[in-house]
């Protein structure tokens, strides 16, 4: 029997984000793969890239395939930069570059750690945020009151490209398959 293991954040641990009559991602996957596959969800809502190491500590010994979706919460952790004063666009780009460099080190290390398990591994990038259609409760602590949701959406999508570029570079550098969540 094949055994799929999901690692990451709320992309896979999304029970609290779906309606009671809807299937979460692990159960959708179970319904698609049938009885020939076992599905284990080690993903945890709120986790960031550095938490994957802890999730791997619980990797079942019979795991045959890994799927990773992480990085969005790493980006959310930097939303406060949107409120920092800057003098030039160049200065803003440099700040984003430095955030990206830190993320790249953590993400690259995480992938190397995952690959030590010698299992077929597929990776998801970060989907576009949808602040305009969801509650802003998760992000209010990062932003000043009275935020314009349209501007927040635009800024987050622009900043997200840095994280997704790093994810895609690190994934393709290792010849791993990528699932682009932006088009789903």
Identify the residue ranges that each predicted region occupies.
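Helix C-cap/helix->beta junction micro-motif
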Residues: 33, 117, 173-174
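Short, well-ordered beta-to-alpha junction loops that form the rim of enzyme active sites
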Residues: 124-128, 181-183
């Amino acid at each position: 029997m094949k055994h799929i293991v999901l690692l990451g954040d709320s992309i896979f641990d999304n029970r609290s984000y779906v309606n009671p009559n809807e299937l979460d991602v692990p159960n959708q996957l179970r319904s698609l793969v049938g009885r020939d596959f076992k599905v284990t969800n080690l993903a945890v809502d709120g986790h960031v890239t550095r938490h994957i190491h802890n999730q791997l500590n619980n990797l079942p010994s019979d795991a045959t395939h890994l799927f990773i979706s992480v990085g969005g919460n790493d980006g959310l952790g930097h939303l406060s930069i949107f409120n920092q004063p800057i003098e030039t666009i160049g200065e803003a780009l440099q700040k984003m570059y430095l955030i990206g460099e830190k993320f790249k080190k953590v993400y690259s290390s995480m992938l190397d750690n995952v690959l030590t398990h010698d299992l077929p591994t597929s990776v998801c990038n970060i989907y576009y945020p949808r602040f305009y259609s969801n509650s802003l409760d998760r992000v209010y602590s990062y932003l000043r009151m009275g935020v314009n949701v349209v501007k927040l959406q635009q800024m987050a999508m622009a900043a997200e490209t840095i994280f997704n570029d790093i994810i895609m570079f690190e994934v393709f550098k290792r010849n791993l398959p990528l699932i682009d969540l932006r088009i789903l």
